């Protein structure tokens, strides 16, 4: 089952070049992983310091393998230096699902 992973980060001002370089390296690392399909980076119109990365993976297992990868953890630690708060993650399944109705 395809999954979309939303990764939300808010960065401190004044480090755009360093952040952009790290994000490019981060994306390149993900692109070489089994199960990676695509990714995009969005900048909030209301708060330009907030970024939303949307990654598409073949499965939750593929995403979790990348999330636990040591190289990814090093990239994450480098990004955290420039962040204003913790990284937030949300996972979504792609496609029609049955929603439980409590009525």
State where each predicted segment sits.
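Short, structured interface segments that constitute the first stable element of a domain
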Residues: 5-7, 16, 25
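Short, flexible segments with low predicted structural confidence
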Residues: 1-3, 18, 34-36
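Short, well-ordered beta-strand segments in beta-rich or mixed alpha/beta enzyme
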Residues: 2-9, 40-67
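Short, surface-exposed ligand-recognition loops at beta-strand->loop->(often short) alpha-helix junctions
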Residues: 10-20
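An amphipathic, aromatic/His-enriched active-site/gating alpha helix that lines ligand/cofactor pockets
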Residues: 25-38, 56-90
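Residues in and immediately flanking transmembrane alpha helices
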Residues: 21, 51, 71-72
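Residue-level signal for secondary-structure boundary sites
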Residues: 15-17, 61-63, 99
């Amino acid at each position: 089952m395809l999954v979309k992973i939303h990764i939300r980060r808010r960065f401190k001002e004044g480090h755009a070049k360093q952040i952009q370089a790290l994000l490019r390296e981060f994306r390149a690392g993900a692109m070489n992983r089994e199960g990676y399909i695509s990714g995009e980076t969005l900048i909030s119109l209301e708060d330009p310091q907030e970024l939303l990365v949307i990654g598409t993976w073949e499965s939750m297992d593929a995403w979790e393998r990348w999330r636990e990868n040591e190289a990814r953890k090093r990239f994450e630690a480098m990004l955290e230096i420039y962040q204003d708060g913790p990284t937030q993650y949300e996972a979504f399944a792609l496609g029609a699902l049955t929603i439980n109705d409590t009525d």
